[in-house]
Amino acid sequence: MSLDLPPPPARGCRNGDVLKERGQREVFCGLTGIIWLHRKMQDAFFLVVGSRTCAHLLQSAAGVMIFAEPRFGTAILEEKDLAGLADANAELDREVERLLSRRPDIRQLFLVGSCPSEVIKLDLHRAAERLSAQHGPAVRVYNFTGSGIETTFTQGEDACLASIVPTLPATEARELLLVGALPDVVEDQAVSLLTALGIGPIRVLPAHHAAEAPGVGPNTVFALVQPFLGETHGALTRRGARHIAAPFPFGEEGTTLWLKAIADEFGVSPAKFEEVTAAPRARARKAVAAASETLKGKSLFFFPDSQLEPSLARFLTRECGMSAIEVGTPFLHRGILGPDLDLLAEGPVISEGQDVERQIDRVRATNPDLTVCGLGLANPLEAEGFTTKWAIELVFTPVHFYEQAGDLAGLFARPLRRRAILRREAAE
């Protein structure tokens, strides 16, 4: 059976030169991952040990008021804590005791480090061990850092999941583990496709509830659904699990190759694969074709933001007819992103890390049709006449798998259509 996909390029970007940037960054910190994780993990609570700035960021980004009692909060470090005039550990213990007595539904508590807690060297790992012993087994306490000193944007989820992996039960069962947080409707689509292929049992990390936590062992194979999970990938590998490498499921091609890699691992016949995927593939291809009319022939520049950039560049160049000038990403994990880089034709600059002033200079020099960047850069670039796309939308919007492929292309087409309308109106 032929997958009826375009042939790979003669030379991809996996083994090409990478421009290493180590300057000023313009990205959100890892605390932002809490915004989608607290919705996914329904018996978890994320307690940020940080400042009022951390609290304002989370409240604003989540779009909820604190009296709504979301599954996150901030233990505020006051001036006396920062000055070493108070026992921050004792105060943290009291806050946790108060929280758990008020919220008996909590089964997983995450102590999340921030810039202030990192600066005063508050040992949240030891605090988590102490509090787990005190409140277990009903509540397990984890810790990870979302500090802007240590992490960028999507690394918060990676650090969170990596903190869970060592505590997962051991198993000898042959299971597929899907790793990465997805909106429930998208996760259901993925599981439905895999189940229709006859693949199972299928487990998910993160689980909705602590009691549903997957096991892991030498017969576990795992597929990542997000490309920013390098630390989690390493933690699972150390537990004996094996990674199924594949392009990420963005667009029709990426989804098909992701599913095919898993299907091959589980011995699914070509005929069965065609039977299950033919209809959703056709829908995805039609939806992408409609949305990509605006994108064909346009040039693209990615600022580093989420680590989705190489996978999205592959989708936009191969399925939407765009050309990439530069593909920037905060970190480049070739073991994870290699299959996508193989399909990204040689040509664009691949940059890792950020030196924002130099990258802005390169945008001005190359004048791309579309620039994908963070919120803080978008308005200044728009004021200079560049068309921009907010990178954060690509994380908070459902964009994975067949049914969202057209929406994904549409996210990039929308700012170009808006710019064209504004130009027509200005000409009139």
From Swiss-Prot:
Q: Which reaction does it catalyse?
A: chlorophyllide a + oxidized 2[4Fe-4S]-[ferredoxin] + 2 ADP + 2 phosphate = protochlorophyllide a + reduced 2[4Fe-4S]-[ferredoxin] + 2 ATP + 2 H2O
**The enzyme's E.C. designation:** 1.3.7.7
Q: Which Pfam families match?
A: Oxidored_nitro
* SUPFAM superfamilies reported for this sequence: Helical backbone' metal receptor (SSF53807)
User: Keywords in UniProt for this one?
Assistant: 4Fe-4S, ATP-binding, Bacteriochlorophyll biosynthesis, Chlorophyll biosynthesis, Iron, Iron-sulfur, Metal-binding, Nucleotide-binding, Oxidoreductase, Photosynthesis
Q: Which NCBIfam families match?
A: DPOR_bchN, PRK02842.1
> Per its UniProt entry, what is the enzyme's top EC class, as one word?
oxidoreductase
What is its cofactor?
[4Fe-4S] cluster
Protein name, UniProt field: Light-independent protochlorophyllide reductase subunit N
Query: Per its record, what are the GO molecular function terms?
Result: 4 iron, 4 sulfur cluster binding; ATP binding; metal ion binding; oxidoreductase activity, acting on iron-sulfur proteins as donors; oxidoreductase activity, acting on the CH-CH group of donors, iron-sulfur protein as acceptor
Q: Example GO biological process term?
A: light-independent bacteriochlorophyll biosynthetic process
Give yes or no: UniProt keyword DNA-binding.
no
Q: How does it assemble?
A: Protochlorophyllide reductase is composed of three subunits; BchL, BchN and BchB. Forms a heterotetramer of two BchB and two BchN subunits.
- Annotated metabolic or biological route of this protein: Porphyrin-containing compound metabolism; bacteriochlorophyll biosynthesis (light-independent)
Stated family: Belongs to the BchN/ChlN family.
Binding of [4Fe-4S] cluster occurs at 29, 54, 115
